[in-house]
Amino acid sequence: HLLLWHEAAGRPSGTDWLAEASDLLLVMTSANPHGEPLVIANDEALHRLTGIADAYLLHDRDIVIRCDDSVVRATPDENQENWGQTPIFLRRARGYVPVPIQLADDGPTVLALGGYLKNTICVIKGREAFLSQHIGGLDNAAAIGFLEETVTHLLAILDVRPELIAHDLHPDFPSTHL
């Protein structure tokens, strides 16, 4: 982000410009239409975000894995010494996946496909549970494709083949048919 401000400041030399006040305000967010997965290719962004985005920040470095922002809540500690150091995850994503959650017991390799709304998947391998990034609602083709990409990627990086698959029994849910 500093490169954007450096450019907007006229490419000053040194570092004094970093401490100076600036009237420039940029609000940037992930590139995705409401309810759809993140757009990861420049040409796709230019096509799908027309009429939504005021401007584009493009780069020649490809995004390989879609991963939205994590949302956490700080937790109070009884004595306030470690306040906020153990987050409560509202949405586990960038920065926290696929960091494993330790389980008490060893078991079979399981792929859990999550629900229809606010979807995420989980792979259990040994005594570790690996949650995927936030996928979102499975109410459009792009989200279903993202679910399929996520399953393929997580199984590949963990080098596992599930012995059991857990899914919702509703016959019309996309995760039931995966």
Q: Which positions does each model-derived feature cover?
A:
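Active-site-adjacent structural elements in enzyme catalytic cores
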Residues: 1-178
